[in-house]
């Protein structure tokens, strides 16, 4: 939506006509008199002293004017019922038509998630009409015929996106096409756009004409990093008009990285919200390639991380799911050769993890239904490579294999050295946790973790075994060719790899923090995407 300056137009309190009850800011310190049952209630701006109580329409208006909820204990609980425990139900195309002024009316419905509650909440429909410099807003939750007439200059248009982005249905569609650029032009675009950003300066070379698997480590919630991985591996393309938008997206993620380092969370969230608005525009220029031959494995911590939002995470997961060999993916034109694994951030966090830790409500919505389809490990029998986010070890004392908070006792396996059987059991155990309704409620911040799940979440994050133990585990496992040991590739706490990595080591840790040596030969860390493909 075209920007509207956040200015307040003063309207005389003495003015009143037969069509409206006018409520000025100073009058609105008290409750709106709904007993009057007027057709239209008009006012300029709500402030911190406004008593809006259980009025859903007024809560919406306050958010649109201020960019956040009116904070008090009661409203916090109501937001959880209305938005944060709701099903994705808003059509983003309808929002875009309203934002582009193609239509002056926008109707959306919030459908509360009633799967795990005793008292059912009814869907709430909100109608917004923009006309003559005013917004006319009505909510079915008001249980009255009141329509609020709000000065358009008091509402910040971008706050519509901030309010609703987490509740957009994850039903993006992508055209399927062939690359229209020459190889030279495509390579030039990729280099000119990504080489300016520190996060991509040390990436290993990925050849989209090579059928060897490309591995990608932690991306920390950066949408740009997932787009980069899919671009260089030949799975997606971007039409010419989209590259300038991609530059803007990357610039905002880089500024968000700086805000994160300086612990300026308000700036971080604002930048990520703007990033998502840019992504919403960029989407129309992204297409899937029908001739991708390079298998890709994403090793986890791509969502639920420091640069995540619900909107960005849903986009990443929906895009990746279109290329996965998974139930429900019926698009035969796309090579289903992308594997996406869950890391501790996917498992533990819904949306931005710094916001969730602070119980800060950055945006509504839930990524659970997309996350729960992910496995935690994958075994490639052809290449004899075992991949996971954490790396798998053997605990001889406890007589089990360990992956994050999961354990597989040796005696639960038909063949205790079979890597494929081991991967299947780990994935089955992971799915049992993800399917637990209690797990879902805790992950969405609806309930505090039980002691058992608090321990589970902690162990999922804190599991950082030594490289030697991961290597020994690979030596113990036996594939179809017992003369070759099983190689492991993982993310999480790995030392990271850069463009100098030439050999396919027995173990490879592809973290976004890379170990390096300073002039005094001390280990230092730099942030950057780790990726590897054998050439």
From Swiss-Prot:
Source superkingdom: Bacteria
Basic and acidic residues: compositionally biased ranges: 15-34
Protein name in the entry: Putative uncharacterized protein YhiL
Provenance organism: Escherichia coli (strain K12)
Disulfide-bonded cysteines: none
Residues covered by region (Disordered): 1-34
Membrane-crossing segments per the record: none
Signal peptide range in chain numbering: none
